[in-house]
Amino acid sequence: MSRIYATGKRKTAVAKVWLTKGSGKITVNGMSLDEWLGGHEALKLRVRLPLALTKMSESVDVVATTLGGGYSAQADALKHGISKALCAMDDNLRSVLKPHGLLTRDARVVERKKYGKHKARRSPQFSKR
């Protein structure tokens, strides 16, 4: 196994992911996962979920770069990218990841603002008289 590449997306965030055989190190934007996410334990668990489900957390190294969005969206994009890369590495892992929805791109994005409204749906206050 050389380097396996995949991209993950969520909202406006994009994660480019490379998997290599290794000891389980996760590097994001040149920092370790703990440095990158600081005290956000829930986000760290979310990123590690595909590796934990496939029991690969000790056998592959993850190198990733993320662009756009916030930390939560970037973490979800990273999770999606890792899942896709694991499937590219071994197609048998698809049956483990698919039931958990890790291979599905979350299509929810911000609804656009409409004219005549304050936000996407918030209308100006209505006065009867």
UniProtKB/Swiss-Prot annotation:
Alphabetized GO MF terms: RNA binding; structural constituent of ribosome
Any Pfam family: Ribosomal_S9
Keyword Cell membrane: no
Record keywords, A-Z: Ribonucleoprotein, Ribosomal protein
GO process annotations (BP): translation
GO CC terms in record: cytosolic small ribosomal subunit
Gene3D superfamilies: 3.30.230.10
Keyword Ribosomal protein set for record: yes
InterPro entries: Ribosomal_Su5_D2-typ_SF, Ribosomal_uS9, Ribosomal_uS9_bac/plastid, Ribosomal_uS9_CS, Ribsml_uS5_D2-typ_fold_subgr
Origin: domain of life: Bacteria
Record-stated family: Belongs to the universal ribosomal protein uS9 family.
Protein name (Swiss-Prot/TrEMBL): Small ribosomal subunit protein uS9
Source organism (scientific name): Nitratiruptor sp. (strain SB155-2)
